[in-house]
Structures are given as structure tokens and as C-alpha cells.
């Protein structure tokens, strides 16, 4: 004991500068050693950690944990020169982070598959514990909050609960009941002799009434029947009934369908082109029981020639026609240009006075690495820059929205206008203009970052300086061209620079610019439209989705690599403004080879985006990306809008149908469109499940 006291005294009180500043760790077995930073527990790990906090604090307070008493004194002996050890620890932390990101990437792929094909009610940020628990429950096990897992014990006088799932079976319930009774009669004696050796699941609730077997005294009372045949037959009966009930419940939902009116019905001077043709078009839509129509209100037309001079006369005439047919109306605040390979002869640019400003100051437009400008929409970096005749970008948007709200106040009061969609980027979607065909982009190219104008570069440099790394204040130089593939670039390739310190910094800043723009505009949209529903369109960027980097999503502004959920952060911002999300559903099924070449996964992307929105409590609507579809295309859209057997019964709040031309010119789609609308309304149901 005397020796031990001397040792402790020497250790805690020594101040000799000649001693080794890095003492031997074996001499101090109780010293706290640096460990890699642990991951924040989620799911069951979080519950277990919370349960263990109180005992741990008691142990500390009572001095029962080894090494607590000498911790302070021990730290004093190692205070000098540990620079090399610190660098090694930092390297080990980084290696641990890389291993963790790789593990999370594998987990995210497993979660996507389970959500898509297994109908498991997994949260968007589920971890492996949640996956194992869901699989265990599906197999009939019980899983407690602390992770304790066990088979259900015998519970007399309680009904056995079997997991329900949809099945495909040609057998009717009556046939299954007959099979069950036959199995019971043939196995009754052997089962009663051997019931103690069977599984511990209680089957007291399974009994046969005397009326089912007249004259047979054995069935005058309820008895435990543990026959395998009885179990399977009755479980099949329950599964069939549950599937029928759940399918009918899902099919009965009423999803409103809106038809998008063609773009060219309002000319560049703000006048209605063909009133009689529009009337005929609306008559066709009314005959199909369409709930309403969607019309683009183009900034480049209404405020096309002079700032703050708004021409609404053509839209007033159009809205009066829509009111005559008693159709609802959704309007789009279209702050982008229209035109391209699929637009025909219709071209709608940004306002002429904006283009004139752009000639003197081209940095008001998005710019790629080679200095080429995109005229699809205004640069988000000028949202708060007074470069538009004394107004900022968001002031221009707000003035336009406020003018519309004032001009058509009577339609809002009547309830004719049910929602307003806010255009937030290229094609009216919340995304960067990263895929311009006029600059050579070809599907499935990864696109290019749009941040090389002076305003964006100043923002990037300021952010880099605040981090203490001024040399990070520039865009990537090795991210390829518009039509490049991920593996062809240093930045997007497997374990490329996108996942380096600089890559994560840049991608976070790039995506935050998108989120910040959405927040700036939506805050003013809520002021302009008050209680009216606000809609924001989210793109479907499904190519390169099977790569680790998700390169196409990154250039479009969604920081969504395989080890990170980029959509939840966007939806958190949209949730603050009670926004309804409109998701552009992917196009028709492509050949497996085409998907493999594009590394595309439209189904996986759809499930991630839709479930991320639902997890945040957002309503979600849909829009088809194709112009005319057959019966198979209709079924795919219906399955997305009204998912079968969803545990929470979620479904789309509306659906917008885009058409290639007026219905009077595209009558070949008429029968399929009629079927599609009836299915969305729940008027007809698919009994083949």
C-alpha cells in the first residue's frame, strides 16, 4: 500500500521538465485513450443509450468508475509535444469516417430496396438496426425498444396476430375454409396427442362451432388446434381478406386530376390566340371529368417589354372561359424561358428588358466553367443584388406575384384558383440549369456546375475564407463536360474528389444556394398569396443514380450521394412554408440495357423523393414527364400516385396530366386518359393484385 501511494504521489505531483512528455500508456491503464469519434446513435441504439445515461452518471458521482479519481492528475503529465500523435489520430479519424460513409452507402441501397419491394415502414433516416427489426417483425418475432428480440410466448385467451401481406392466389376464401376444415378433421387426433411438442404460439382463438359439424360432439367447445394445415389455411384466409380490404381502401382514394393547357394559347403580346379552340378543348376536358386545368403565367409575356408594366388581359379572357366550364384552376408563376427541341415553334424568353440588362452585365445569368451563359432563368446569386433597374431578384418575383394576386382577387375569393405553383429554376423546377441541350448536353450526361459568374464566385470565396481555406474559393476543374459519364471524371468517379474535404465543402455550398433561393422566394410567395396552396416542382434526375456520387443530381443542386440524403434537407425548408411538392414522375420504362448504360434507377429515385416528402409531413402531387402514354404507362403512374398497401395510407393529393397538343388533335390517347382519370378518382378498381 505504501508503494502504491508513492506511485500515485509521483504521478500526480511531478513537475520535472526532464521527464518524457509522452508517458508509457502501460503505466496508466485507467487513462482515457483517444477513440475514433462514434456515430450519433439512432433507432434502437439511441433508445439503449438513453436508458444507460442515468446509471452512468450515478457511477461517476459515486466514484465507482475506474480511473475517475486520477484523470485530472494524469492529464498534467502528458501536456507537452504530442504533435505527431495528434496528426496520427486525425488520420485515423478520417479513415474511420471513410469506412463509415462506405458502410452507410451499403445501408442506403438496402433501405431503398426494402422500401421499393418490401413495403416496410422504414423512416427516411433508418439505420441497420431498423432494417433488422423490420425483418424480424415480418418473420413473426417480437422486438422491444431496447433491442431485445424473442419469439412470442403462449398467451391464452388472446387472438393470434399473423403478419398480413398481399398475395396472389386464385383461391377464394370459401375454398380455403373448406380446406381448413378438412385438414382439421384429418389431423385432430394426432394433434391433440402431440400439442405439447408444437410451437409455443397460442392458437386458442381457432375453434370450430358445433353448427359447422352437426352431430359431432368433439366440436361442441373451442379447443386448441395447432394443425399445420389449419394454421396455413386460416392464415391464407386472413391474408386474402386483409389484402382485399387494404387494396380497396387504397383504390377508393380520390386523387384530383388537372390537365395542363398548351403553352401557345397566349401569344408574346399577352393575347388569347384562339378562344373558340380553347372552348372546344375545355369541353373535351369537362367530358373526361377532369377536376381542373393548369396554366402557365409567363413572366416573359406579362412583364415582357417594360419593368413593372403587367399585361393580364389575355389571361383574364382565358380564366373567364375556364370559369364558364366550372373547372378549378392552378396557375404557375413561370419565371423561366420556354423553348427547345420538344417545344415546337413556341419560344418564350425572359423579359426583353432583362435580356437587355444581361448584355451589359451577363453575370445575372448562370455561367458554366467555360464562361457560357444560360438564359433559362435568373442567377440565384442576384436574389439580393440590386442589378435589375434598382430592384433585386426576389423583389422582381414578388412584384410579379403581387400584381397577379391583385388583378385576379375575385377568382381567389370565388375559390376558382385553388393553388399557385412557384417557378424556382430551370423548367420551372427547383434545380440549376445544368442540362442545356443548346450547349451540347445529351442524355445521360452528368451536366455541369453553374456557379462561375462573378456573384456566385464572390459568395464561394467568402464562404471558403470563413472556413479558413481561401484556396477552396473556386469551382471544380476536373468535373468533366455536359455529356460526360461519372467514371470519366476525377471529381465524380468512385472515391473521387466529390467526397474529399474540398468536395464536401463545395457541394454543401452549392446545394445551400439552391435551398436559400427557395427560402427567399417562398417567404415572399406566402405574403403575396396568403392562405392559397403553394406548389413547388421537384425534378426527377434518375440517371447516374446507381453510382456512388449521383453526379447528375449534384450538378443540379441536390447533394444526394449514396451516403447522404439530400432531399430531406430541401423538404425541411419547404415544410416551413407549408408547401405542396409536385414530383415529376419518370418517363416510360426503358430497356434494361438503356438503364444500365445510363446507370439509371427511376424507381429508386421516385421512392426516395416521395417517401422523404411524406416523412417530413408534406403533401405531394405528381406530373407525368411524357406527353402521351398507353395503358401500361397509366398503370405505372397510378401505382406511384396510389401505392398499394402503404402502411400509412399515403397517396398523391393531385396529379397534373401533360399533353403534347390539344386533346382535339391527340384523340389517340383519349381512351387511355379516360381510364387513367377514372382510376385516379376511384371510380374503377383493379381487382388483380
From Swiss-Prot:
The cross-references to SUPFAM superfamilies, in alphabetical order and at most eight, read: (Trans)glycosidases
Keywords from the named record: Carbohydrate metabolism, Cytoplasm, Glycosidase, Hydrolase, Polysaccharide degradation
Gene Ontology biological process terms in this record: polysaccharide catabolic process; regulation of shoot system development
Provide the residue span(s) of the region labelled Disordered: 1-100
Indicate the enzyme's highest-level EC class. hydrolase
Using the record for this protein, list the coiled-coil segments as residue ranges, or answer none.
Answer: none
Please list the residues that bind substrate.
Answer: 296, 336, 537, 624-625
Q: Where is the active site?
A: 429, 623
Q: What is its EC number?
A: 3.2.1.2
Under the heading Gene3D superfamilies, the entry gives: Glycosidases
Superkingdom per UniProt: Eukaryota
- Which residue ranges have biased composition labelled Basic and acidic residues? 85-97
Catalyzed reaction equations:
Hydrolysis of (1->4)-alpha-D-glucosidic linkages in polysaccharides so as to remove successive maltose units from the non-reducing ends of the chains
* Compositional bias segments (type: Gly residues): 66-83
GO molecular function ontology, one term from the record: DNA-binding transcription factor activity
Q: Where is the composition biased (Low complexity)?
A: 1-12, 27-38
Q: Which terms in the GO cellular component ontology are assigned?
A: cytoplasm; nucleus
The Swiss-Prot or TrEMBL record describes its family as follows:
Belongs to the glycosyl hydrolase 14 family.
Its name, as the record gives it, is: Beta-amylase 8
Name its species.
Answer: Arabidopsis thaliana
Amino acid at each position: 500500500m505504501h508503494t502504491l501511494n508513492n506511485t500515485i504521489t509521483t504521478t500526480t505531483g511531478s513537475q520535472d521538465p526532464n521527464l518524457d512528455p509522452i508517458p508509457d500508456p502501460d503505466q496508466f491503464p485507467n487513462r482515457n485513450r483517444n477513440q475514433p469519434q462514434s456515430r450519433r446513435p439512432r433507432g434502437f441504439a439511441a433508445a439503449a443509450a438513453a436508458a444507460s445515461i442515468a446509471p452512468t452518471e450515478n457511477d461517476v458521482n459515486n466514484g465507482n468508475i475506474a480511473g475517475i479519481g486520477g484523470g485530472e492528475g494524469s492529464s498534467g503529465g502528458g501536456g507537452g509535444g504530442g504533435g505527431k500523435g495528434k496528426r496520427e489520430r486525425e488520420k485515423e479519424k478520417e479513415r474511420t469516417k471513410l469506412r463509415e460513409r462506405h458502410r452507410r452507402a451499403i445501408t442506403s441501397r438496402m433501405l431503398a430496396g426494402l422500401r421499393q419491394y418490401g413495403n416496410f415502414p422504414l423512416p427516411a433516416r433508418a439505420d441497420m438496426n431498423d432494417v433488422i427489426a423490420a425483418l424480424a417483425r415480418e418473420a413473426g418475432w417480437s422486438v422491444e425498444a431496447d433491442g431485445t428480440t424473442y419469439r412470442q410466448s403462449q398467451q391464452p385467451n388472446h387472438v393470434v396476430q399473423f403478419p398480413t401481406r398481399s398475395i396472389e392466389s386464385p383461391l377464394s376464401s370459401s375454398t380455403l375454409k373448406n380446406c381448413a376444415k378438412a385438414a382439421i378433421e384429418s389431423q385432430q387426433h394426432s394433434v391433440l396427442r402431440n400439442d405439447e411438442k408444437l410451437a409455443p404460439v397460442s392458437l386458442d382463438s381457432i375453434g370450430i362451432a358445433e353448427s359447422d359439424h352437426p352431430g359431432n360432439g368433439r366440436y361442441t367447445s373451442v379447443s386448441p388446434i395447432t394443425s399445420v394445415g389449419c394454421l396455413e389455411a386460416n392464415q391464407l384466409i386472413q391474408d386474402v381478406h386483409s389484402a382485399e380490404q387494404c387494396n380497396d381502401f387504397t383504390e377508393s382514394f380520390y386523387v384530383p386530376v388537372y390537365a395542363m393547357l398548351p403553352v401557345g394559347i397566349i401569344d408574346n403580346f399577352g393575347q388569347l390566340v384562339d378562344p373558340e379552340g380553347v372552348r372546344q378543348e375545355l369541353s373535351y376536358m369537362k367530358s373526361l371529368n377532369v377536376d381542373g386545368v393548369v396554366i402557365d403565367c409567363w413572366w416573359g409575356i406579362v412583364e415582357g417589354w417594360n419593368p413593372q408594366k403587367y399585361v393580364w388581359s389575355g389571361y383574364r379572357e382565358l380564366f373567364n372561359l375556364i370559369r364558364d366550364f366550372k373547372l378549378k384552376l392552378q396557375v404557375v408563376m413561370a419565371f423561366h424561358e420556354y423553348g427547345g427541341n420538344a417545344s415546337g415553334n413556341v419560344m418564350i424568353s425572359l423579359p426583353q428588358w432583362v435580356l437587355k440588362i444581361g448584355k451589359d452585365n451577363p453575370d445575372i445569368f448562370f455561367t458554366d466553367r467555360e464562361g457560357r451563359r444560360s438564359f433559362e432563368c435568373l442567377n440565384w446569386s442576384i436574389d439580393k443584388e440590386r442589378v435589375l433597374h434598382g430592384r433585386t431578384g426576389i423583389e422582381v418575383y414578388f412584384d410579379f406575384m403581387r400584381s397577379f394576386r391583385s388583378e385576379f382577387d375575385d377568382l381567389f375569393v370565388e375559390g376558382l384558383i385553388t393553388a399557385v405553383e412557384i417557378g424556382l429554376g430551370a423548367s420551372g423546377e427547383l434545380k440549376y440549369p445544368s442540362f442545356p441541350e443548346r450547349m451540347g448536353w445529351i442524355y445521360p450526361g452528368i451536366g455541369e456546375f453553374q456557379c462561375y459568374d462573378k456573384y456566385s464566385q464572390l459568395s464561394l470565396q467568402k464562404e471558403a475564407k470563413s472556413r479558413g481555406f481561401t484556396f477552396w474559393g473556386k469551382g471544380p476543374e476536373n468535373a468533366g463536360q455536359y455529356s460526360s459519364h461519372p467514371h470519366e471524371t476525377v471529381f465524380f468517379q468512385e472515391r473521387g474528389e466529390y467526397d474529399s474535404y474540398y468536395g464536401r465543402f463545395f457541394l454543401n455550398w452549392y446545394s445551400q444556394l439552391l435551398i436559400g433561393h427557395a427560402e427567399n422566394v417562398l417567404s415572399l410567395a406566402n405574403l403575396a398569396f396568403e392562405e392559397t396552396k403553394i406548389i413547388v416542382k421537384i425534378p426527377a434526375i434518375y440517371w447516374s443514380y446507381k453510382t456512388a456520387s449521383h453526379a447528375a443530381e449534384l450538378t443540379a443542386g441536390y447533394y444526394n450521394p449514396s451516403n447522404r440524403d439530400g432531399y430531406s434537407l430541401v423538404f425541411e425548408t419547404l415544410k416551413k412554408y407549408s408547401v405542396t411538392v409536385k414530383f415529376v414522375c419518370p418517363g416510360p420504362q426503358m430497356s434494361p440495357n438503356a438503364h444500365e448504360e445510363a446507370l439509371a434507377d427511376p424507381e429508386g429515385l421516385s421512392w426516395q423523393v416521395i417517401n422523404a416528402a411524406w416523412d417530413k409531413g408534406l403533401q405531394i402531387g405528381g406530373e407525368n414527364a411524357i406527353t402521351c402514354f398507353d395503358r401500361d404507362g397509366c398503370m405505372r403512374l397510378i401505382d406511384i400516385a396510389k401505392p398499394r398497401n402503404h402502411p400509412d395510407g399515403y397517396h398523391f393529393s393531385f396529379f397534373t396530366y401533360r399533353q403534347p397538343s390539344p386533346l382535339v388533335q391527340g384523340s389517340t390517347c383519349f381512351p387511355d386518359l379516360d381510364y387513367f382519370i377514372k382510376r385516379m378518382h376511384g371510380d374503377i378498381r383493379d381487382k388483380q393484385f
